Amino acid sequence: MNIIPCSIKTLKGLYDISGVEVGQHFYWQIGGFQIHAQVLITSWVVITILLGSVVIAVRNPQTIPTDGQNFFEYVLEFIRDLSKTQIGEEYGPWVPFIGTMFLFIFVSNWSGALLPWKIIELPHGELAAPTNDINTTVALALLTSAAYFYAGLSKKGLSYFEKYIKPTPILLPINILEDFTKPLSLSFRLFGNILADELVVVVLVSLVPLVIPIPVMFLGLFTSGIQALIFATLAAAYIGESMEGHH
């Protein structure tokens, strides 16, 4: 029986897992500020992929759409329907915002699984998907908060703040707390799911052959897309709620 070799192999796998940790960050010093370079680099890559894909697909629009043009028209129609469902008839001005959120998060999430970030060596730390960093998800959530405050104020003016005392002033603390929990839930849900997916893959690769974690990686691609959809749907719902009233 090969009990001892198997035990040694298992212990080695557990030792490898013990070495999985959150690495150091790579910073740029600009003036008196420390800039988180890892997030900026990967975010620029994602933005370049998005802009490049759009330019290539629709640089020469045709009356009879090509495959690339068809795909982006379908994506636009999907985002438009999502915005209309959640926001209502005044959805038009918010389609670019919701679309930007959805596409950036979707491509960022998928880049973590499909792009070989880790082969690029940095002086400190390593590259990963932008949404694998809490700074990115918090920034996206704060942008969403600013958007629904702007939507409510532009529609109702200062009377927007009446929602905090409806249906009764007793609920004022809870209604105020709700505006703090929205960005928290958005940011930590997205960050936690993407980070957990990458950690699960790292642990499985350390324990078993590479072929076995592949189904988990495909599941990660699916959940990454779902997370982008959830974020965009909630962002649109919050904007619609701020324009319509307290629910």
From Swiss-Prot:
Key component of the proton channel; it plays a direct role in the translocation of protons across the membrane. It is found in: Plastid, Chloroplast thylakoid membrane. One of its GO terms (cellular component) is chloroplast thylakoid membrane. Belongs to the ATPase A chain family. F-type ATPases have 2 components, CF(1) - the catalytic core - and CF(0) - the membrane proton channel. CF(1) has five subunits: alpha(3), beta(3), gamma(1), delta(1), epsilon(1). CF(0) has four main subunits: a, b, b' and c. It comes from the Eukaryota. Its main location: plastid. Gene3D superfamilies: ATP synthase, F0 complex, subunit A (1.20.120.220). InterPro entries: ATP_syn_F0_a_bact/chloroplast (IPR045082), ATP_synth_F0_asu (IPR000568), ATP_synth_F0_asu_AS (IPR023011), F0_ATP_A_sf (IPR035908). Keywords: ATP synthesis, CF(0), Chloroplast, Hydrogen ion transport, Ion transport, Membrane, Plastid, Thylakoid, Transmembrane, Transmembrane helix, Transport. PANTHER family: ATP SYNTHASE SUBUNIT A, CHLOROPLASTIC. The chain crosses the membrane at residues 38-58, 95-115, 134-154, 199-219, 220-240. One of its GO terms (molecular function) is proton-transporting ATP synthase activity, rotational mechanism. SUPFAM superfamilies: F1F0 ATP synthase subunit A. It is a multi-pass membrane protein. This is ATP synthase subunit a, chloroplastic.
